[in-house]
Amino acid sequence: MLVYIFAYEGSYGGLHGMYDEDVVEVRDMEEANNYGYEMAAGVVESYDCFDEDIEQELEWRIYKIKEGISAEEARAALGSYDEEGFVAEYCEKEVLS
């Protein structure tokens, strides 16, 4: 399953560029959630500006990429859209996680 993952931390909710995003091929939702967790943890660690327990601040959304769109095509478009625009163009509307 090809998915788009938008990972961030809860304090800023992805504002100020404090987020990560990627298009990945996963076997199931468990694997997608593992990617989301690692990506969100990477966001928090990269900014090194949170004193509280970061575990509670890790958040991510997972969307299924529309049929007929390749990983390469979707990945190439990431920098051209914000999350909402990318989802509208390349993803099914339902949030999987």
Across the structure, where does each feature detected by a protein language model lie?
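A broad, low-specificity signal marking well-ordered, structured residues that form hydrophobic/aromatic
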Residues: 4, 24, 60
